[in-house]
Amino acid sequence: MSESVGNIRIDPRDTIFAKIISGAIPSKKFYDDEYCIAIEDINPQAPVHLLVIPKLAVGGLSDVANVDLEKYKESMGHIMSKIHHIASLKGADSYRLVINEGVLGQQSVRWLHIHILGGRQMNWPPG
C-alpha cells in the first residue's frame, strides 16, 4: 500500500487526502457519500478542476493488488457512476478524467484520486 520515493516510504493513510476525509483538515467538500468526496483542486488547470477522492485508502493504481479487490471494485464502480453528477454540480457537462500514477505520472498525493477537468476545450495530445 505504500510507495518508495527515494528512500522515503509513503503510506496513503498519512496523506493530506486521508486527513481531509477524516475531517482532521477542514475542506470545502461539495460532494460526500459513502464511497468518496469531491473538492475543487487548489491549483486548477481548467475553469472546472475537481478532485474525486475515494474513501478507500489506495495509494495508486499500482497498489490495487494490495487491497480487497471486491471493496475496490465496489468503490470505483460507484464513483464512476457518480462522475457525471459530480461534474454537473459545478457546471461541467463535458470534461476529461485523469488519474495520475506514480512519480513520473505526476501523482502529487499518494492516494488514488480522479481529476475532472472541464469548462474549456480539451486539446490532444494533453501535454
From Swiss-Prot:
One of its GO terms (biological process) is response to bacterium. Coiled coil: none annotated. The gene is pkiA. Residues 16-127 form the HIT domain. It comes from the Eukaryota. The lineage of its organism: Eukaryota, Amoebozoa, Evosea, Eumycetozoa, Dictyostelia. This is Protein pkiA. GO terms for cellular component: cytoplasm; extracellular matrix; phagocytic vesicle. Pfam families: HIT (PF01230). It comes from Dictyostelium discoideum. SUPFAM superfamilies: HIT-like. GO terms for molecular function: hydrolase activity.
